[in-house]
């Protein structure tokens, strides 16, 4: 989209198990998608637990071992950007054409166990560049002394899609139970990482003192039934609303009193950037890695997984004067420009060349 040499840059996406299938209509027609397998195995692979994910991981590794070697040696790309399931292409670099340079894109806070440390260290010479989404992750990788420091860069995720935002922000929030209601919003997968149990406990603790507020949780996940039972047990079901997955979170943010991120960890925390884009007041856990880098002094950070501190920061937010809130929003909105697609593209080009 942003390249001045569109005819010279050929971009190809490798689809190993059907992971790109649902995004086909969103991908530029000039970008080729190469499917390693006809069947979309992603629909059948076990997930939602560590053991199940390891089984899926091994299956994907074995299924695509020779296919990926054949493809890379046939195509001979200048660069191969590897992301999420990184061990297969990194291991196969032993068999790749030496022309192809591997760029390791670290996404999310990596668990640097013994195996991963050994693996990355062993293959470090085969990796051309490494990108990290946050300064904290960058420092973590540097301190482990796995790669040559000159190979490692901070590359912010391309979270902000301006065209999409401008379109979605025009949509009205036509939800009857939220009409004329003041509400706090939480957004994310309903998983242990997002820590929505803390959010529900927080709301129970403040609801008598601040009866004007409702709590809206947006997302789906394996903890949905647990959270629903918790809401009923605490007798707050009339004021807590689990809305499920929503294609447009902006209309919720734009109509909320504040956004709360309760996560145990992030890297960097996409929804914080989306909230800042909508000028929403932000209260976030001071979890690793990312929220503190984004918010700095322009929001309200509470101690990770600390209920009392969350309540304190919420009350501090309520007492903060509107002119101070506005000033914080303006400063934060300027900072998140580094999370646009254009900024990501320019930085990536600098890193590659």
Could you describe each region identified by the protein language model?
Residues 61-64, 82-88, 106:
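Short His-centered aromatic/hydrophobic patch
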Residues 245, 264:
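Aromatic "clamp/platform" in nucleotide-sugar-dependent glycosyltransferases that forms part
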């Amino acid at each position: 989209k942003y390249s001045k040499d569109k005819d010279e840059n050929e971009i190809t996406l490798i689809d190993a198990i059907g992971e790109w299938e649902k995004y086909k209509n969103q991908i530029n027609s000039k970008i080729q998608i190469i499917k390693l397998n006809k069947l979309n195995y992603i629909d059948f692979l076990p997930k939602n637990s560590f053991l199940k994910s390891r089984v899926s991981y091994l299956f994907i590794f074995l299924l695509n071992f020779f296919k990926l070697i054949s493809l890379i040696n046939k195509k001979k790309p200048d660069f191969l950007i590897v992301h999420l399931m990184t061990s297969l292409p990194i291991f196969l670099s032993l068999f790749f054409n030496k022309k192809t340079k591997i760029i390791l894109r670290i996404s999310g806070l990596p668990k640097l166990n013994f195996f991963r440390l050994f693996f990355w260290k062993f293959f470090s010479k085969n990796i051309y560049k490494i990108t990290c989404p946050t300064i904290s992750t960058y420092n973590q990788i540097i301190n482990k002394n796995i790669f040559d420091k000159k190979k490692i860069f901070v590359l912010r995720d391309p979270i902000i899609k301006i065209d999409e935002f401008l379109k979605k922000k025009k949509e009205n929030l036509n939800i009857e139970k939220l009409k004329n209601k003041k509400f706090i919003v939480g957004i994310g997968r309903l998983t242990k990482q997002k820590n929505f149990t803390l959010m529900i406990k927080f709301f129970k603790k403040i609801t008598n003192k601040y009866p004007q507020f409702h709590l809206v949780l947006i997302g789906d996940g394996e903890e949905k039934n647990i959270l629903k039972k918790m809401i009923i047990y605490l007798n707050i079901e009339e004021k807590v609303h689990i809305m499920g997955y929503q294609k447009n979170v902006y209309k919720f943010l734009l109509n909320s009193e504040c956004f709360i991120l309760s996560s145990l960890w992030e890297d960097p925390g996409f929804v914080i950037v989306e909230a800042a884009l909508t000028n929403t007041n932000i209260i976030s856990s001071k979890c690793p890695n990312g929220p503190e880098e984004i918010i700095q002094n322009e929001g309200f950070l509470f101690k990770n997984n600390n209920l009392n501190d969350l309540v304190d920061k919420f009350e501090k937010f309520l007492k903060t004067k509107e002119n101070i809130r506005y000033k914080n929003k303006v400063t934060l909105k300027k900072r998140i420009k580094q999370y646009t697609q254009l900024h990501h593209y320019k930085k990536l080009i600098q890193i590659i060349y």
